[in-house]
Amino acid sequence: GFREDVITYISKREGLPNAIPIPVAAGMEHYNCGPHLYEYLKEFHDDVLSKYDCFTVGEGPLITPEKVLRFVTEDDTQVLKTMFSFDHLEADCFMTDWIKTPFNLKKMKKCYQKWYDAMNGKGWHTLYLENHDHPRIIDRYGSLKYRVESGKMLATMCYLQKGTPF
């Protein structure tokens, strides 16, 4: 397989325009899902990936399900098999782990439902709760006092959904 880290950041708008001032990821509106992203991914897919029987997963911070479907829909336009999103990890933060907010279970559930509804029958979704960017999920969404129970609960919640577990 092949993992394409923060792949949605490889296409930037021309002219180096000024960014909207926000506390994190300044300028993201100019490089997240930029104007040539699909073109670049299509070229990489056609010239390299299509020559191998391989699984590809992209990472797309702050991407919508509708944009993900542009890349993973199972037809002749497909350039990735699936893509990581981070929406479900924003149940206790704003855009990034550095701006903490109280945990919001309803927000997390709405996020999972939104992605399930969008991807169902059109593309394949990724299932994960932590990675190198977002470690220690039991400490974050569970209880250290009940770490075994928390781990089982989080794993059950994650892995009984439709998608590929990571």
Predicted ranges, named:
Residues G1-F166:
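Active-site and adjacent substrate-binding regions of carbohydrate-active enzymes
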